[in-house]
């Protein structure tokens, strides 16, 4: 162990009673022998300016490494650690007033006053003893590969007047400090001060040493320094009291600098690092993405526990229900999250789509009327070539000609109805499968409705879509009793005095309705609602009655009657198939097979 001797001359004796204690050899149990303070030999016994060992002992209960400490009245330096033992023995023999002091389990490197070196000398030095101009220049442990960071003067261990951070002996010393077991008391290890008299080799030191008894744990982002290891080590200033202690507690550099590690930089949901606010609350990127996905997908979570699962950085992914509930509890706003239709449109809200003119009720009504007029024969081009008003009915079984006429009238009407349907706004946008399904399902109903509206039941005239005019008796053998039901429906329909726009809307509603097997029933329903609204507005404007709803209800009441007449038509086709006089056309046969209710 290095030998430490005073390098000053004999100063004036200190008047304090502790400075006059004899340097007796202490036992390993750290007990001091009693002595008479009034003895005249005690005054010049220790004429050195080094701190008394009672200062070391007060407040410290740890173990000390054993080494010899020689107090000498002369100022002869010892040059190496190997000459310490011989110097101690010779000094004991020549100076009876001085005594050797032995400590157990305690090591001190460079913690004694001496000449302070500048920052350049401190960098070039390799031992802790050189920094203070110690007479004993024994090298201290160091780590050559470690490069100390460039810190400010007060961010180092002891500032520019302290050993470098490569000094590992200091860390070993701090690890041997005892744990505080009781109420914290102000520690007082040793306080360095210059000798009473001015010394040319010692400059006033601005440092006070108050090592903490509790180990200081470094926070995230902090570097190891004496300020963090020993918070009590603070520079003395005129603002401090005589003891060199601060009146207020010393805060760490992390709290003073407002680092992101503070509470304002933490996620309000899980406590992770958060750089900015998301959806109204400071949150991390993980909680922001979780909240966004949950709102956009409208996800529903279930808690497998008691809905009070802990949500922190480590356990935030365990329960999605509790995590989302905490997001709402801390104030995250769901309405701020953009929906799928707004992705990629920052700073813009969707403008209200302007209703195109072709989808307006007036334009829809005009299109329906035009489609109806184009699909029907004009009154100036009716074909009366086969009309026989006075023809006698042929009672008995129908022949092949009557059955073939029946099939031809049905097949011709199907092509006209198909062309009419293609002119209805919105029908062409439906899928081809839905178009065929709607046409085949509503064909017989449309055939009956259109025939009944064009015909003149009072005169017994039946006007078909091709312009052919036949008398009721001419159709009796082919249509059977079904023709009489059609004429009865025609009379009831004409009694309502239905104009062309209302009839065009009613015909479209017969086609555009819900059918079993539709691929896009939603689109069919939307188109049906538009046509129904158009019909309602027209009837309300043209009826001229106090209660226009009654006229609309009577008009819509004809739709169930059409279903009944459609069933009678299927029965007639089935009967003709059983007679097997003429094979039905493929399109009629397909319609029959697809629309059978059984």
From Swiss-Prot:
Annotated segments matching region Required for nuclear import: 171-466
Domain NR LBD: 360-595
Keyword Transcription: yes
Gene Ontology cellular component terms for the protein in this record: chromatin; cytosol; mitochondrion; nucleus; transcription regulator complex
Positions of the UniProt region annotated as Required for the interaction with RXRA: 299-361
Region listing for Binds lipopolysaccharide, in residue ranges: 521-544
Entry-annotated residues carrying Phosphoserine: 341, 351
Compositional bias (Low complexity): 134-145
Domain of life: Eukaryota
Feature: DNA-binding region: 264-339
Cofactor detail note: Binds 2 zinc ions.
Gene3D superfamilies, per database record: Erythroid Transcription Factor GATA-1, subunit A, Retinoid X Receptor
Localization, UniProt: Nucleus; Cytoplasm, Cytosol; Mitochondrion
UniProt zinc finger (NR C4-type) residues: 267-287, 303-327
Region (Required for binding NBRE-containing DNA): 268-354
Needed co-factor(s): Zn(2+)
Family of this protein: Belongs to the nuclear hormone receptor family. NR4 subfamily.
Function: Orphan nuclear receptor. Binds the NGFI-B response element (NBRE) 5'-AAAGGTCA-3'. Binds 9-cis-retinoic acid outside of its ligand-binding (NR LBD) domain. Participates in energy homeostasis by sequestrating the kinase STK11 in the nucleus, thereby attenuating cytoplasmic AMPK activation. Regulates the inflammatory response in macrophages by regulating metabolic adaptations during inflammation, including repressing the transcription of genes involved in the citric acid cycle (TCA). Inhibits NF-kappa-B signaling by binding to low-affinity NF-kappa-B binding sites, such as at the IL2 promoter.
Oligomeric form and interacting partners: Binds the NGFI-B response element (NBRE) as a monomer. Binds the Nur response element (NurRE), consisting of two inverse NBRE-related octanucleotide repeats separated by 6 base-pairs, as a dimer. Interacts (via N-terminus) with NLRP3 (via LRR repeat domain); the interaction is direct, requires binding of NR4A1/Nur77 to NBRE-containing dsDNA and lipopolysaccharide, and leads to non-canonical NLRP3 inflammasome activation. Interacts with GADD45GIP1. Interacts with STK11. Interacts with IFI27.
PANTHER family reported for this sequence: NUCLEAR HORMONE RECEPTOR, NUCLEAR RECEPTOR SUBFAMILY 4 GROUP A MEMBER 1
Protein name per UniProt: Nuclear receptor subfamily 4 group A member 1
UniProt gene name: NR4A1
